[in-house]
């Protein structure tokens, strides 16, 4: 499970910013939203992030995606490849300060695998790894597994499978160790592979969509989700069809992207085809047959739910971690509430975690849905640096955290307005 992420000098985050999923001890808050790990660590299963306009909240999710790709894929880089060659990664430092724009990006992440707490630290620029450290804790005492400064790597208590010499200045040692067969590194590698970051310009790959046909339980899940959204689709099917590359939507844009990565342009590609079956009625209101509609005939909202459904299903089924940017762009409030409550349940979807950004005010009722430590805010300071806070950091009275009072306290929080005295305890 994910515990903490620290970001420093990355995109809009100038100073060290910690996104923590550690639960704050409060007897008044419900316990169903947390899981207890070793060493007396209670971890939240869900977290909601609100933002003020132009606060760059998406950069928080980009940092997660960057850490994931670096760990899972940096072994692919040749000795002279820049780090941003990995999936168009952005490794820009904070550029609105003369000092930070010349300094490396820094990440720290704490997570749990099989009751072991790991802490991983990373510092890098666009061409090289500056430092890299890995620690673990099974009991109360933390031990160092390996440390790295530039190309000097010291192994303390870690099986690198004799692959230390294969680490170039632009490869993460952890990524190389996993590729070369280190069992502990492979376990950590799998953990990061199972973190999903969902942006709305993303859609499932053909391989993921092919998996849908292999899982009989996904189809009822998807139908249930669509029908809860009042779409009343009777049936769904999916197939792959080979079509000429130039017939793809936005083929010229795709072509330019492939050419920028020195990837050959294929003559034909496999495109996924969804059919949605809606009932056809006779004059007496009886269903007489079903008509198949292409997914292109469905609404934009239906297509968004379709894209998101696979990620939600996969995370629930395999106990993974899901970050979603602007979840309210797809899900109706009732669906969103149902999803949050499902993830919050301790005995259901046991080790799943979901973190999302939203401006949906219908989930603000803490007594029924959220703890105060599950609600976060991203704002920007006068120097245009993003800051992250959570509601439990201040003494706002619990009864004020409702949709009715949203516009009072959200603007107090972000703009420090005159409502402050009304919302704070005496």
Regions found by a protein language model. Name each.
Residues 1-72, 282-416:
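Switch/communication elements of ASCE P-loop NTPase nucleotide-binding domains
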Residues 4, 18, 106-110, 119-121, ...:
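Beta-strand secondary-structure signal
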Residues 7, 109-115, 136, 278-284:
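Short acidic, glycine-rich loop/turn motifs
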Residues 8, 205-297, 415, 419-426:
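Extended helical coiled-coil dimerization/tether regions that scaffold
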Residues 14, 102-104, 115-117, 126-130, ...:
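Coil-to-beta-strand transition motifs
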Residues 35-48, 52, 62-119, 125-126:
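Conserved P-loop NTP-binding catalytic core
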Residues 51, 56, 87-88, 115, ...:
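Low-complexity basic/metal-binding stretches
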Residues 117-252:
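Electropositive, glycine-dotted interaction segments
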């Amino acid at each position: 499970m994910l515990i903490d992420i620290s970001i420093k000098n990355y995109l809009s985050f100038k100073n060290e910013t910690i996104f923590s999923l550690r639960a704050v001890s409060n007897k008044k808050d419900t316990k169903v939203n947390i899981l207890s790990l070793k060493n007396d660590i209670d971890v939240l299963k869900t977290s909601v992030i609100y933002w003020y306009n132009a606060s760059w909240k998406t950069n928080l999710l980009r940092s997660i995606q960057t850490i994931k790709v670096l760990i899972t894929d940096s072994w692919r880089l040749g000795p002279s490849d820049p780090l941003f060659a990995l999936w168009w990664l952005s490794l820009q430092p904070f550029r609105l300060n003369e000092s930070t724009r010349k300094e490396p990006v820094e990440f720290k992440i704490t997570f749990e695998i099989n009751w072991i707490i790991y802490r991983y630290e990373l510092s890098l620029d666009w061409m090289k790894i500056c430092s890299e450290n890995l620690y673990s804790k099974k009991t109360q005492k933390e031990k160092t597994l390996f440390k790295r400064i530039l190309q000097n790597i010291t192994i303390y208590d870690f099986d690198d499978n004799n692959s230390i010499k294969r680490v170039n200045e632009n490869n993460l040692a952890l990524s190389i160790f996993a590729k070369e067969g280190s069992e502990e590194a492979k376990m950590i590698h799998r953990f990061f592979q199972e973190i999903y970051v969902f942006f709305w310009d993303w859609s499932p790959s053909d391989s993921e969509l092919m998996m849908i046909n292999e899982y009989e339980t996904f189809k009822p899940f998807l139908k249930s989700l669509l029908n809860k959204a009042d779409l009343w689709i009777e049936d769904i099917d999916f197939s792959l069809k080979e079509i000429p590359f130039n017939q793809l939507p936005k083929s010229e844009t795709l072509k330019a992207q492939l050419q920028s990565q020195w990837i050959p342009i294929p003559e034909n590609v496999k495109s996924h085809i969804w059919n949605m079956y809606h009932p056809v009625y006779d004059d007496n209101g009886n269903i007489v047959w079903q008509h198949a509609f292409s997914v292109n005939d469905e609404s934009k909202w239906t297509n968004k739910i379709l894209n998101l459904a696979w990620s939600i299903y996969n995370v629930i089924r395999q106990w993974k971690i899901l970050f979603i940017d602007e979840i309210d762009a797809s899900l109706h409030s009732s669906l969103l509430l149902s999803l949050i409550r499902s993830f919050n349940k301790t005995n259901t979807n046991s080790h799943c975690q979901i973190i999302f950004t939203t401006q949906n005010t219908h989930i603000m009722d803490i007594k029924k849905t959220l703890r105060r430590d599950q609600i976060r805010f991203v704002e920007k300071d006068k120097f245009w640096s993003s800051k992250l806070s959570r509601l439990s950091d201040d003494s706002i009275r619990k009864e004020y955290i409702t949709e009715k009072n949203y516009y009072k306290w959200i603007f107090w929080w972000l703009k420090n307005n005159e409502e402050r005295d009304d919302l704070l305890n005496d």
